[in-house]
Structure formats: structure tokens, C-alpha cells
Regions:
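Divalent metal-binding pocket/active-site signature
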Residues: 1-54, 66-67, 74-75, 79, ...
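Short hydrophobic/aromatic-enriched beta-strand-loop microsegments
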Residues: 34-38, 57-62, 146-147
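Amphipathic alpha-helical segments at domain termini/boundaries
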Residues: 93-95
Length: 150
């Protein structure tokens, strides 16, 4: 984490089943100053809000689309869209309707659709904002947005 801060690079955190403990460490290290994202978030609403309040992003994968994960969709609905990211965990965790098949990066569109449904927003709005969030998070040139999916 010290290297992350020194290089001013955003931190990607994989903290499966340890989201709250990881958040405590991230807060103690002021990780929000440079930026961090909780990859493949599966924690609680309280932890997700803590991530946002600490300056981090919450990222969802194909598991958001699974029937059993209504609570995870409620968490996505409760968070500000400006703090959400979408991703896959390819080649694993393919979203519905591709569940059981090899996950591909383009399946992240299904994650965006699930967020749009959960938040009662248009798919295009979710896709545009999560693309902007990603560009800003990684410090990419804004020209990247002109090639973003429409």
C-alpha cells in the first residue's frame, strides 16, 4: 500500500470474505487519497457505504446477476452511481444468461444491465457513468470515452 501511495496509482483490492477488515486497513492507510476499488464486491451495505465514504469505488461482477444475490443488487441500488464500477471475473463467474459458460470481458454489459434495473435507471446512463468512473479512476485520457460502448 505504501508503494501504491508513492506511485499515486489506484489500488485494486480483492478481499473476498474479508471486506470489512480490508476496509479498516484501507482507511488507516488513507487509500482514498489516491483511490481504491473493491473488486468483485460481496460484502454488506454497511461496508459498501464505508468504502464510498473512504473515497473508494465498489465494483460488481457477474455474481450481481445471480438470482440468489438480491441483497447484492440492493447494495448496488443504494450506492451513488459515481462510485460504482463494472467488471467481470473472467474466465469465472459468468453473469446470467451466460452462467455455467466461460466468462468473457464483454459480459460486463450484463452487470451494467443489472445495476440499471436495480437503480431504476436507463442502461445507457449506467454504462456511460461507469465508463467515466473507470477512465477517471485509472487516469486514462478522456478520448478513451469516444470508443466506449454505446
Amino acid at each position: 500500500m505504501k508503494l501504491h501511495a508513492a506511485l499515486k496509482n489506484p489500488l485494486i483490492v480483492h478481499a473476498r470474505d474479508a471486506e470489512a477488515a480490508a476496509l479498516d486497513i484501507l482507511k488507516s492507510e488513507d487509500a482514498g487519497e489516491v483511490g481504491f476499488v473493491m473488486h468483485c464486491f460481496c460484502g454488506t451495505l454497511e461496508t459498501a457505504r464505508g468504502v464510498v465514504n473512504a473515497g473508494g469505488h465498489v465494483s460488481f461482477t457477474g455474481n450481481l446477476t445471480f438470482k440468489k444475490n438480491a441483497e447484492l443488487r440492493a447494495i448496488a441500488a443504494a450506492l451513488p452511481l459515481e462510485r460504482l464500477m463494472i467488471e467481470t471475473d473472467a474466465p469465472y463467474m459468468a453473469p446470467v444468461p451466460y452462467r455455467g459458460k466461460r466468462c468473457e470481458p464483454w459480459h460486463s454489459m450484463e452487470v451494467a444491465r443489472a445495476i440499471a434495473l436495480a437503480k431504476h435507471l436507463e442502461f445507457d446512463e449506467v454504462l456511460a457513468q461507469t465508463c467515466c468512473n473507470t477512465v477517471k479512476f485509472f487516469g486514462l485520457p478522456e478520448a478513451v470515452l469516444s470508443s466506449a460502448p454505446q
